[in-house]
From Swiss-Prot:
This is Small ribosomal subunit protein uS4. Part of the 30S ribosomal subunit. Contacts protein S5. The interaction surface between S4 and S5 is involved in control of translational fidelity. Keywords: Ribonucleoprotein, Ribosomal protein, RNA-binding, rRNA-binding. The keyword Transmembrane does not apply. GO terms for biological process: ribosomal small subunit biogenesis; translation. One of the primary rRNA binding proteins, it binds directly to 16S rRNA where it nucleates assembly of the body of the 30S subunit. With S5 and S12 plays an important role in translational accuracy. It comes from Trichodesmium erythraeum (strain IMS101). PANTHER family: 30S 40S RIBOSOMAL PROTEIN, SMALL RIBOSOMAL SUBUNIT PROTEIN US4M.
Length: 202
């Protein structure tokens, strides 16, 4: 599965709110399409698959990337689901989004890919870069970069910055103070179902 570039609201109506993908919320209680209102009991597999798709669309990763994250989380020990969410949340594109520097993860990824973001004073253009405690995330010293972020700060995707991050709006400088806590993950997700999905695929 490649990265999704189609209508975002259609995905939100099918999977529920995806704060990383779009600020729009599902207005209808049933999925899109001609038979959207016909509610059928879903299989356990369908439920696990849906949870996995939430992660894919919210964080903007492809199937292959997510599988790599799952394998890495397994090797790390502890709760695989918790570590999986930490790996996704600590990506540079998501960190830029959670700092309020971009309204969505796709727009944060664009900022990173185009070289507008620095980590410890050096431009990092890899969206999947894993941010670490103590690192400083800031905007490149160019007027265009600063204006883009200043505009984005007026329309943040989420109201609150997580407790493991801090951001100085005047200096446009953020800092990673630790690893994200589970309670600060904005996406409504059951990560255990995703771990189960991949354990059954193995």
């Amino acid at each position: 599965m490649s990265r999704y570039r189609g209508p975002r609201l259609r995905i939100v109506r099918r999977l529920g709110d995806l704060p990383g993908l779009t600020r729009k919320s599902a207005r209808r209680a049933y999925p899109p399409g001609q038979h959207g209102q016909n509610r059928r009991k879903r299989s356990e597999y369908a439920i696990r698959l849906e949870e996995k798709q939430k992660l894919l669309y919210n964080y903007g990763v492809c199937e292959r990337q997510l599988l790599r994250y799952v394998k890495k989380a397994r090797r790390a020990g502890g709760s695989t689901g918790k570590v999986l969410l930490e790996l996704l949340e600590m990506r540079l594109d998501n960190t830029v989004f959670r700092l309020g520097m971009a309204p969505t993860i796709p727009s944060a990824r664009q900022l990173v890919n185009h070289g507008h973001v620095t980590v410890n004073g050096k431009v990092v253009s890899i969206a999947s870069y894993q941010c670490k405690p103590g690192e400083v995330i800031s905007v490149k010293e160019k007027e265009k970069s600063k204006e883009m972020v200043k505009t984005n700060l007026q329309y943040p995707g989420l109201a609150n910055i997580p407790s493991h991050l801090e951001f100085d709006k005047n200096k446009l400088v953020g800092k990673v103070n630790g690893i994200v806590e589970r309670e600060w993950v904005a996406l409504q997700i059951n990560e255990l179902l995703i771990v189960e999905y991949y354990s059954r695929q193995a």
